[in-house]
Amino acid sequence: MIKDNNTSKAITQATHQETLQKYDVKFTVNGKECNVKVKANQPLRDVLRRKLGLTSIKDMCGGQGACGSCTVIMNGRPILSCSTLAVDCDGAVIETAEGLADSNHPLVDTYVMNWTAQCGYCTPGFILTAKALLDHNPNPTVDDIKEALGGNICRCGNYHVHIKAIQEAGQKIRERK
């Protein structure tokens, strides 16, 4: 095969130009409409943290999608914001821990009452995953909770307390109905 260096160079330059190009993206975060310019390869995590100042979104695994600390809720489902391109979020409804903290959701109280956070690094990802679960199933079994939390890592090994807090929040949700 004959390699054409000029063609190779042109493709590389075109690809590089595409990643530098900025796109207008509009989405709703914690009930507020946001308009941002993003690069094609920019993760949602970086946009939320750096452009919008929402620092509950963490990065424990270096953007590998392996820890759950960057979890947000998008259109009702938990997603890893480190592996979701911001350009793909146009029109989305996004919830972060900052939005949950301002609500009267039972998870906020049960997480505090159970001393769920030790170092606190994983807490936003866990609590948003739990909220998405409880929004769809307010009476989850322990196995349901474990399955939902399967993508979240707690460096302190505090898993049993997360489960207890989620069960108690589910009970409070069921009592409200």
Mark where each language-model region is.
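Signature of N-terminal electron-transfer/Fe-S-associated modules in redox systems
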Residues: 2-177
